[in-house]
Amino acid sequence: FSNPLRVLIDFQGPLAWRVPQVKADPACNKWFVRWIVLKEKQEIIGSTSFHGAPDSDGALEIGLGIESEYQNQGFAKEALLGMWRWALTFPEVQTFRYTVSPDNLASIALINYFGFEYKGQQMDEIDGAENIYEMRAVDFIAKWGSN
């Protein structure tokens, strides 16, 4: 693959947090960064990553970024659906979580498309105020399937 847009190079995004996590616990690497690749050009146009392994309640949070010229073309939907379906192969995953700035209307529309439920807000020390959305794994399977 080529990376002409320099995804995760000029702005490290999740790598700043994920690399130290993997150094501390290499087994957690499977939950981290996946490239989003434009098939026709074999170019990286974004990335997605879980924030870590499922927590003690089985909740699994995800984040993603798509380069601006490729937004609103379905790539985020495809990437999230693929990641969540992959995560369902691990029985410890009970709930999917998605947090987003209340100002990020496109991302809120995306998570509403999937049918996630708004759970409230939290204050993130880096990102500031975030809306919290969740969907139980069994509800996800009922709506979207597992493969």
Which ranges hold each PLM region?
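Surface-exposed, gly/pro-biased binding rims or lids
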Residues: 114
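Glycine-rich acyl-CoA binding loop
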Residues: 74-77
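GNAT-family acyltransferases
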Residues: 1-61, 66-69, 82-86, 90, ...
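Conserved beta-strand-loop-alpha-helix junction that forms the acyl-donor binding cleft
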Residues: 98-108
